[in-house]
Amino acid sequence: MRSYRKLSTFLLSIILLLTLLLTPVQAALLDEVRTIIEAAYVDPVDEALLQADSVEEILEKLNDPHSVFFTPEEYQAFLDSIGDSRFSGIGVQIESVPEGILVVNVLPNSPAEAANIRAGDIILSVDGKSLQGLTTEQAVPIMRGPEGSQIKVTIKRGKSIFALPILRQTVVIPSVKAELLDKNIGYIDIDSFGLESISEFRQGVDALRSKGAKAFIIDLRNNTGGYLVSALDIAGYFIGSDPALKTQSRNKTSITNAYKQRRDISEPSIFLVNEFSASASEILAAAVQDHDKALIIGQTTYGKGTMQRVFQLGSGEGFLKLTTARFFSPNGNTIEGKGIIPDLLIQENDPLKAAQLLLSGSGTSHNITFRIGRLNYSVDTRIAATPDYWSAYQELINQLPDYTLYRLSEESEWQVTDPQQLQESYLFYFPAYQKLNHLESIPEDKEFCISFSQALENESFNKDTLQLIEASSGERIALDFLFLGSRQVVVTPKSKLEEGKSYWLLIHPEVELSGQGKLGIGRVTTIKVGTKESLETIKVL
């Protein structure tokens, strides 16, 4: 019993000593943090956690990466990191990862770009100070500093680790950038949701409309969040004052509506997202997706479905950013840990190209229109068939939902895609072309004899009117032509074809028949390379 009493007295002495070591200000801050967490944290908190001896220990036991204590300097850096900002630093957007700080994006004309830092690099340390285990808010003050000062950053790129000297410079970041693409598509890149974002967005929309924008692409890639009010403002352009999200705090569930704007965006619109689209970005993307106001393209988003509130401690001696609620999409879908799944998952190609294609239709006979969800999007197949867009369109087709409705013109009937059509994807590149035949197991050095029922105008037969295209990449294979009389031509690829690959031999409508004018309707022969030995004749009636 005596030993127990001695131990109890010893432990009590330690607790009293630790308490006495805290200054009155620190003790007051600690008590205030305990009170705030007990009352406002999203989940009930164990009493033992609140009895920890310091703010840092309480937050460590809370095990919530989004609940953070700021010094006044760290809080100012946190505010500077949201939205439009001017600061002295190296010019990177970052996320915290276990090894250190991940570079999400390198700003144009920044010191980081000049030093060849790349997105995907991990910053391990700055001037020998490890960034491992730090939040982004804690890392920012370390990376920023007086203009003209030099720091040495240690970078991990793949398996390589190396150090780089970087000179800090003033970096200015507008949160919204707007430009016109393809003469009629308004492209708006929202870098983050700052307090000025809505006015910048409004100015961008108005300017793009004045330049002739008939559709919009909203780019939320690498946008890690910001002020909720700005996301709700921008959501109002698309969903009016309808519900934008559901929130669930410890004691209640509520619905938050978007803020209706003086003029909505009713033009066809597409949102781009990726794995670094988080928080307020996910709120905006989920809102337009649930209300069927826009198509979402890209990769599954980050999955940060919690909301934080900042509490000032004392008279400004510190600040507590605390998770106070979880949020869900308007339809109640969970975002935390799951993210927003795009309507079209584009991972191998640039989602921007896929979006441009879906908005490229111009009411011509070359359009193919897809109905995705409740919305229609038209592709100009002439653009889709160019080398720059071929691969992106191929992935787009492969990612179409099963049995997607499509039509070949405004006057034609809606049809439904099926697995066979998706395998023969030439239908979506050259929808009006007539299929002649399919050649299987064709050798790598194959020659093709094309036979016409009428005499040809040989001058109309050239590299633009007859093409051999590798189906998956869109690569054009150079050809030699040998005319056999007036009705036959032997076509020889200048390089060997690749075994196992598929090719399309295309006779375009511009080929002319003697005395008859242009062919009018294109022809396609599908080819699978194998080992068969023979001279194939392709007949064009």
Listing of model-derived features with the role each one plays in the protein:
Residues 99-102, 124-126, 138-178, 324:
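PDZ-domain C-terminal substructure recognizer with occasional recognition of PDZ-binding tails
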